[in-house]
Amino acid sequence: MSRLIPLELPPAGGHPHHVLLRLPDGKPEQGPLPLLCLLDGQWTLPLLEESGHPALKRCAILSLGYQGERDQITRYRALDYTPPGPDGGLWEDPRVPQWQAGGAPAMIEQVRMALALAQGMEPALAHSRISLYGHSYAGLFVLYALSQQSLPIHHYLCASPSLWWRDPLIWTLLEQLGKPVQVDILAGASEAWYPLSAQAAGPEGRKNGMPTLPTMQKLQAQLQAQGMQANLHVLPGAGHGHVLAQATLRALELASSAA
């Protein structure tokens, strides 16, 4: 059993965030519960709930997600999870110019407020080891948060991060990192990058994909060179669409067992 507590944040970027704090019943066996901060909670939290994974009994979860139609959520994600332009402001998404992008600094503040609300609701969480997890665009946001290191995050988990987004922007941001932290990269063995978005490709689908695993290995090497405890977890047989479920469960395992 568990407790699911709704938390209210002021809207950011012109849209609200649906925030839930999930607490397992009972007291932790040893020390404070680890806290896993889930992005895209509209998809990731149900995946964990339905899994019945035993790690749910030893980990608190802070879920930040969206409500609405999928097309609407896609636009929200493009705004919230992407780095700002050279002037620090908003700009357009490179693959879908109709999408506004560059709202990651505002999303950083949303995560900060959500963590403060969660710790106010459950004071013991003030002593928790906090992990931040995101997939795809949300994985890009996790790396942006790592580059800023302005959140009280101890452990960063990025699944299939959108490293291609305005390449080499995120690589540049990751060149000057601060204190060493744990970073876990999760990637599907069969993933590929396509120059067209799924929406732009239309019913015929996308072709001529470029394998992304070598890029994930490059990311691991760059982070390790800066003293990060960077690990790469390859999910066998998984393409981009299948990574979300596998990676989210793996993220729970890593967050709940991280020292």
Segments from the language model and where they lie:
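Catalytic active-site module of serine/aspartate enzymes centered on a nucleophile-bearing elbow/loop
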Residues: A247-A259
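Gly/Ala-rich beta-loop-alpha elbow adjacent to hydrolase catalytic centers
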Residues: G134-A138, V142
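Short beta-strand immediately N-terminal to the catalytic nucleophile in serine-hydrolase-like folds
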Residues: L132-G134, A159
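The feature captures the conserved acid-bearing segment of alpha/beta-hydrolase catalytic domains
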Residues: C158-H240, A255
